Curated annotation (Swiss-Prot):
Entry annotated with the keyword Metal-binding: yes
Cofactor(s) needed by this chain: Mg(2+); Mn(2+)
Positions contributing to ATP binding: 134-185
One GO process term, biological-process aspect: regulation of cell shape
PROSITE patterns: ATP_GRASP (PS50975), DALA_DALA_LIGASE_1 (PS00843)
Binding site for Mg(2+) 2: E266, N268
Name of the protein this chain belongs to: D-alanine--D-alanine ligase
Species: Citrifermentans bemidjiense (strain ATCC BAA-1014 / DSM 16622 / JCM 12645 / Bem) (Geobacter bemidjiensis)
Length: 305
């Protein structure tokens, strides 16, 4: 859609929601809403709850900019509702969203696409743990983002606590072999890589606090990688985005070793849009200001089914 066509439509920025990432989503949504209003769009913010269908109808929403993170927002739930209501929306569709947030399902697809993954095992609530990889390992819920519930276990005495924490958020968890590498994240827009940023967290890894606390991590743009490795991580980012059938934009997370191996961690279909978020920073490095990034995402809004 052209900018002129979009400015005639009532746009809702969907934010907040019911997940463990609610506060981050509110920050993303407020930033997007402020940008849209500044650019002259008829935009309103909606804090998503179980009354979302009624709110969308009452506001006579014609297009939705999804700024939700985590469950009930990034997992295909809201996307399915918008499809049923005939409201075009930003980001990926129902299936790609559901696959991306499910780390177990997405790993199967990534492996079939030839993408490199850390060795892992799946543990379901109630099952006995028979550790398949030597310590250290990374324990994480299957369907959460922003490193919620994630822990690194180096000592056997800490394993149960890490399992308990991950099971707080999901009935299925992943236990991955630890990869010693640089944390590198690739920004994707309209299916093409914008660039790659390197993250150096102040703590043990890039956890929730490091992601959303000013000064919690050092960002290096572009990532300090040899030219050939940098090109490869961009290519792998585009490949992962396409493998899940993602639409328009995403952020793809990797660990890159000293030998240049790029281990794929996950694809985020609704990456953060806050002042500390990485996709806007990567886009800025490619010459795309925040307002322009918001506009390009909005212009790609559509029904996917």
């Amino acid at each position: 859609m052209t900018v002129e066509e979009l400015k005639k439509k009532k746009i809702a920025v969907l934010m907040g929601g019911l997940s463990a990432e609610r506060e981050v989503s509110l920050n993303s949504g407020k930033a997007v809403l402020a940008s849209l209003v500044k650019q002259g769009f008829r935009a309103v913010g909606i804090d998503v709850g179980r009354d979302l269908p009624q709110r969308l109808a009452e506001e006579q929403v014609e297009l939705a900019f999804i700024a939700l993170h985590g469950r009930f927002g990034e997992d295909g739930s809201v996307q399915g509702l918008l499809e049923l209501m005939g409201i075009p929306y930003t980001g990926s569709g129902v299936l790609a969203s559901a696959l991306a947030i499910d780390k177990i399902a997405s790993k199967v697809i990534f492996a079939s696409a030839g993408l490199k993954l850390a060795p892992y095992q799946v543990l379901r609530r109630g099952e006995e743990l028979k550790l398949a990889n030597p310590l250290p390992v990374v324990v994480k819920p299957s369907r959460e983002g922003s490193s919620v519930g994630v822990g690194i276990v180096r000592d056997p005495s800490r394993m149960q606590a890490a399992l308990d924490e991950a099971f707080r958020y999901d009935s299925e968890i992943l236990i991955e072999g630890f990869i010693d590498g640089r944390e590198v994240q690739v920004g994707i827009l309209n299916g093409k890589a914008l660039g790659a940023i390197e993250i150096i967290p102040k703590g043990e890894f890039y956890d929730y606090e490091a992601k959303y606390t000013d000064g919690g991590a050092q960002h290096i743009l572009p990532a300090r990688l040899p030219e050939a490795v940098y090109a490869e991580v961009l290519r792998q980012g585009e490949k992962a985005h396409a493998a899940l059938g993602c639409d328009c934009y995403s952020r793809v997370d990797f660990l890159v070793t000293e030998t240049g191996d790029c281990f794929l961690l996950e694809v985020n279909t609704l990456p953060g849009m806050t002042d500390l978020s990485l996709l806007p920073e990567i886009a800025g490095g490619a010459g795309i200001a925040f307002g322009e990034l918001v506009l390009r995402i909005l212009q790609a809004a559509s029904l996917k089914i």
